[in-house]
């Protein structure tokens, strides 16, 4: 295995600074490994010429002792729903197959300014509508932890940011950018055994992220450690004049305390009883219990809490998701945006044929359902009711994070991320998209509904040798404590994200 893959981003950039390694060498090896592991289908498009140019510029900065930031020369992959200047951005859909943006998403431009090396675009579910990265026009993405990548018994990478998660887990890059609307960064992080961060809504700009659900979409970060996630977050977070939903105040870069410097006796951990739900595997439950005990033994206060509207959240999320999808997808008419059909007998026919050819069945179903729910006769009964329940869900979190009594108040919530280990592709694909998301998003989408930060961290391997992960959530803009506790857990469990016999899969 490439020795530097075991290093953190800080260790990597230190090796650049002292001349032990060079950005060009690391980039070349990343491009080579990405080709050798093409069977994963993590990347839909590599950009080798751009990456080599960025690596060369980074190397020159290090030679002058003038690196741009702590990310200078670090290889990063970008999900294919973030606009990248002069590089195709397709959302893994025929509708945008020929779209080449003339500008960068803010996340991408800030990474470039930080000196990062952008390797290419990663696979995803079409328009991010899925939880498995299985319905892309480029084919499904495989999980590097699969027992056998060549047979029909391989495991899904999760979704919809499965390409970025798979690339990070396989060591093809040091970090990946995903999006997270209902768990699309944390879900694949859980299945692929990496860290997946969903920041507070508004902390990271959505400018240039092709929208799915404007009120919930958040750029996400995938990396092999919590510290690496922090390095990327520090580069991309903060106000953006191009996105009116970003925070107004300047972002203060996070500096996590040393693991031994975190006083857990001042931290209160909540265990939401509603997350002990149907379908939760015995191994995930056991992992959840052991980590709660680990925190308690180290001095943290651990108590059960209630989030009473959790059971309704998946239904509310589904309604709001489909309504916003119907609105956002209306722009793709074959004239202003998107694939254009050859049939131009009439404007109506052109619209209909372009959308029929450009969208897959999953996208069409959500559009149709969303438009039905938004009909005048249904608007109050479905959409407005869902908005009211969404407010109640957000208030559930406020009540536990900001309870008047200190005894009832918690700082962090500890839950499962996914209910099971990564399922086999053949089992997952036998379910409808609706059923897939109902299972996969149960534990993750409430954080999006409330706009709070959440992070998934790998804990251990299942008896089948697959990663099992847990999720931490906290109040808005409390990433400092959230990630400090996550890093403490990470240090205790010492999970190796690269312990999947990569050499055998490269040979």
UniProtKB/Swiss-Prot annotation:
Pfam families attached to this UniProt entry: Amidase
Subcellular location: Mitochondrion
Sorted UniProt keywords: ATP-binding, Ligase, Mitochondrion, Nucleotide-binding, Protein biosynthesis
Active-site residues from the entry: 79 (charge relay system), 160 (charge relay system), 184 (acyl-ester intermediate)
KW GTP-binding (keyword) present: no
Keyword Disulfide bond in annotation: no
Assembly information from the UniProt record: Subunit of the heterotrimeric GatCAB amidotransferase (AdT) complex, composed of A, B and C subunits.
Protein name in UniProt: Glutamyl-tRNA(Gln) amidotransferase subunit A, mitochondrial
Record organism: Drosophila pseudoobscura pseudoobscura (Fruit fly)
Name of the gene this protein is made from: GatA
């Amino acid at each position: 295995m490439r020795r530097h893959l075991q290093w953190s981003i800080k260790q990597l950039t230190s090796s650049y600074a002292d001349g032990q390694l060079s950005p060009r060498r690391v980039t070349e090896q990343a491009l080579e490994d990405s080709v050798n592991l093409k069977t994963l289908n993590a990347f839909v498009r590599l950009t080798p010429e751009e990456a080599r140019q960025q690596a060369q510029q980074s190397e020159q900065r290090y030679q002058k002792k003038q690196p741009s930031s702590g990310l200078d020369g670090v290889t990063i992959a970008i999900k294919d729903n973030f606009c990248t200047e002069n590089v195709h951005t397709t959302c893994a859909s025929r509708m945008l197959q020929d779209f080449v943006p003339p500008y960068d998403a803010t996340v991408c431009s800030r990474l470039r300014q930080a000196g990062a090396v952008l390797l290419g675009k990663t696979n995803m579910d079409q328009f991010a509508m899925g939880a498995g990265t299985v319905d892309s026009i480029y084919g499904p993405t495989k999980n590097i932890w699969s027992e056998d990548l060549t047979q029909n018994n391989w495991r899904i990478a999760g979704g919809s940011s499965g390409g970025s998660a798979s690339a990070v887990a396989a060591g093809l890059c040091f970090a990946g950018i995903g999006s997270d609307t209902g768990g699309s960064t944390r879900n694949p992080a859980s299945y692929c055994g990496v860290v997946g961060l969903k920041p507070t809504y508004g902390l990271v700009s959505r400018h240039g992220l092709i929208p799915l659900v404007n009120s919930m979409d958040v750029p996400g970060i995938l990396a092999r450690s919590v510290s690496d996630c922090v390095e990327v977050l520090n580069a991309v977070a903060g106000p953006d004049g191009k996105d009116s939903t970003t925070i107004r105040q300047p972002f203060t870069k996070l500096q996590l305390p040393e693991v031994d410097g975190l006083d857990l006796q001042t931290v209160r951990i909540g265990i939401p009883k509603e997350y002990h739900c149907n379908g939760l595997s015995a191994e995930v439950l056991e992992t959840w219990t052991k980590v709660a005990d680990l925190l308690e033994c180290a001095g943290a206060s651990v108590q059960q809490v209630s989030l009473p509207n959790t059971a309704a959240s998946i239904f509310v999320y589904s309604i709001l998701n489909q309504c916003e999808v119907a609105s956002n997808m209306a722009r793709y008419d074959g004239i202003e945006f998107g694939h254009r059909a050859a049939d131009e007998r009439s404007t109506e026919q052109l619209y209909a044929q372009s959308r029929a050819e450009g969208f897959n069945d999953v996208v069409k179903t959500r559009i149709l359902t969303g438009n039905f729910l938004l009909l005048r006769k249904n608007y109050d009964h479905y959409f407005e009711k869902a908005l009211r329940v969404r407010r109640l869900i957000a208030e559930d979190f406020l009540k536990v994070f900001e309870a008047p009594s200190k005894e009832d108040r918690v700082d962090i919530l500890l839950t499962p991320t996914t209910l099971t280990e990564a399922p086999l592709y053949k089992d997952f694909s036998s379910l409808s998209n609706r059923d897939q998301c109902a299972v996969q998003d149960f534990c993750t989408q409430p954080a999006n509904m409330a706009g709070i930060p959440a992070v998934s961290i790998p804990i251990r391997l299942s008896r089948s040798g697959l990663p099992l992960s847990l999720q931490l959530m906290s109040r808005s803009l409390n990433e400092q404590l959230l990630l400090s506790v996550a890093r403490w857990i990470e240090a205790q469990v010492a999970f190796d994200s690269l312990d999947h016999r990569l050499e055998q899969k490269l040979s």
